Amino acid sequence: MAETTVRSLFRTPPQADLSGVKVSGWVRTMRESKAFAFIELSDGTFFKPLQLVLEEDSLPEYKEMTRRIGVGASVSAEGTLILTPDAKQPFELKVTSLQVLGESPSDYPLQKKRHTLEYLRTIQHLRPRANLFQCAFRVRSIAAQAVHRFMHDRGF
């Protein structure tokens, strides 16, 4: 099964439920209850995260997975993309298979709350995962491409 990016899902949203979708990324947030859990997954390609829905009935290793997964963990998920027009997000992924690629420590520094720039300066290796820096790097990349194209088109 070919892996897709969060960006491609949001840029060209499906018109109907789509099975066989595989995505990988980092867990931004996780909310869980006894029978189901919600994970916001970001792969760094888009500013909005993809919501994953884990249900105990459809995921045999539900208990173990929810125990191992925390904010910052790296996961790969497969499932069915379900349209949710009445919810905040246009769709969500109902997970049928989940693999933990890398666990995160309990003291992982990036949490759901907003962090100050001073704090982000102390964790330089994780700054690209913060929304502020992802946006800044995208703007910088587009500006550099525009300057490069301008100079190239004029023979420089």
List each language-model region with its residue ranges.
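Class II aminoacyl-tRNA synthetase catalytic cores and aaRS-like
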Residues: 1-156
